[in-house]
UniProtKB/Swiss-Prot annotation:
This is DNA damage-inducible transcript 4 protein. PANTHER family: DNA DAMAGE-INDUCIBLE TRANSCRIPT 4 PROTEIN (PTHR12478:SF7), DNA-DAMAGE-INDUCIBLE TRANSCRIPT 4 PROTEIN DDIT4 (PTHR12478). Belongs to the DDIT4 family. GO terms for biological process: apoptotic process; dorsal/ventral pattern formation; negative regulation of signal transduction. Pfam families: RTP801_C. Regulates cell growth, proliferation and survival via inhibition of the activity of the mammalian target of rapamycin complex 1 (mTORC1). Inhibition of mTORC1 is mediated by a pathway that involves ddit4/redd1, akt1, the tsc1-tsc2 complex and the GTPase rheb. Plays an important role in responses to cellular energy levels and cellular stress, including responses to hypoxia and DNA damage, via its effect on mTORC1 activity. Plays a role in neuronal differentiation, neuron migration during embryonic brain development and in neuronal cell death.
Length: 219
């Protein structure tokens, strides 16, 4: 009997054969211009929901009017609870943005933009291991061929970011004649005016723990 056991224990099961997935180039050719523009931007302001300048300092009386729709696909209670606070912080960053290159005093953010952005953030964070808490968000405003960096937001500083979202916002196209006038004349001190953002935007998602291709979604 011992001899039989020794013979059995001497047998070994061959290890499984693992095929390594080919490394894919992260930035596709169609995104090269966006990556080059955003990579050359000056260092942006950093914000966090857990920092001292948190969303609790925001004075948004009309925020309760914005609500996120229920969806069976977005069953992340923690993310849904966190999202309104994150949108408050995003709105505060856009309101405080240093936009001297646009020669306007402030950006106007439509509620439709924030509502659509909230849905998109939940959608892109749903498959992530830490959900929305693992997001690193870069806010940018496109005008013409330029891309102006507004702020970088770390949703939760206690969590190592697992994915990066670059939100590309656009100015309202109906304001283009006014914008052309701003760029065609010399700047006048104190002549800045408000410019409204378009409800549409584009989001670029990069997984920081994977070599998967860049995900681009436009709303």
């Amino acid at each position: 009997m011992p001899a039989r056991w020794d013979t059995f224990s001497a047998l070994s099961v061959p290890p499984p054969i693992l095929e390594e997935e080919p490394q894919s180039q992260f930035w596709g050719e169609d995104c090269a211009d966006v990556s080059q523009r955003c990579s050359s931007l000056p260092s942006s302001d950093c914000e966090s929901l857990t920092s001292s300048n948190s969303y609790s300092e925001c004075d948004l009386d009309a925020w309760d009017e914005i609500s996120l729709p229920d969806s069976e696909l977005l069953n992340d209670p923690e993310g849904e609870q966190l999202c309104p606070s994150l949108l408050k912080l995003i709105k505060r960053c856009l309101t405080k943005a240093k936009i001297n290159s646009l020669r306007c005093s402030r950006l106007l953010i439509p509620d439709e933009l924030l509502c659509n952005l909230g849905q998109e953030l939940l959608h892109l964070a749903y498959s992530e291991p830490c959900g929305l808490r693992g997001a690193l968000i870069d806010l940018c405003v496109e005008h013409g061929k330029d891309c102006h960096s507004v702020a970088q937001i770390t949703v939760d500083q206690a969590v190592v970011p697992t994915f990066q979202l670059t939100v590309l916002l656009r100015l309202d196209s109906r304001l283009w004649p006014r914008i052309q006038g701003l760029f065609s004349t010399k700047p006048v001190p104190g002549s800045g005016q408000s410019l409204k953002l378009s409800p549409g935007f584009k989001v670029l998602k990069k997984k920081l723990y994977s070599s998967e291709e860049l995900i681009i979604e436009e709303c």
